[in-house]
């Protein structure tokens, strides 16, 4: 689920999309009870925004000709590369541990698409007026093709010897970059992503070092 923090504000609902790819974890050492690792991913991700087009009474704006509620969403496809410090507490080799992921994330733009029921360049006649006059985002092309920000995740890992590691995680990403220009000459002062990701992962051991302290 994702949205874009526009300034001036654009009313939105959460935009749904898929995130999936490959993960790699390198366990460095165990300090006291903390298992310290480096965790990286290469993911294909669909992010964007879904507009909540309402009138002054918080009711959907109805297109006169079709009698449909106005709808607009933009899906933007990225290759996302997060690199995390992975700190875990609990069992490393067999059983359950709880972990925290934190670190930077980079996104490389692939493409984008619109899903709408009206002509964004020629606004239709409506039965009621939309409360927000901000519509520039509907026709603007994505300017900045590199996205970057920070992510924080909380999850659990269950390990079974000779089978692998099963991970479940909830993660939040806050974009530090903007998808549109943000200078004084640009329309938007801010246009950064906020993304909530729920992930299930499976990891298997490629190589292991002998360590009698592991449990």
Residue ranges of each PLM-predicted region?
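Extracellular/periplasm-exposed beta-strand and loop segments of Gram-negative cell-envelope proteins
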Residues: 1-15, 47-78, 109-147, 178-195
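Residues on the lipid-exposed face of transmembrane beta-strands in outer-membrane beta-barrel proteins
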Residues: 20-28, 44, 81-87, 102-106, ...
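Short loop/turn motifs that connect adjacent beta-strands in outer-membrane beta-barrel proteins
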Residues: 29-36, 90-97, 160-165, 207-215
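Predominantly the C-terminal beta-signal and adjacent terminal strand-loop region
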Residues: 142-143, 147, 155-215
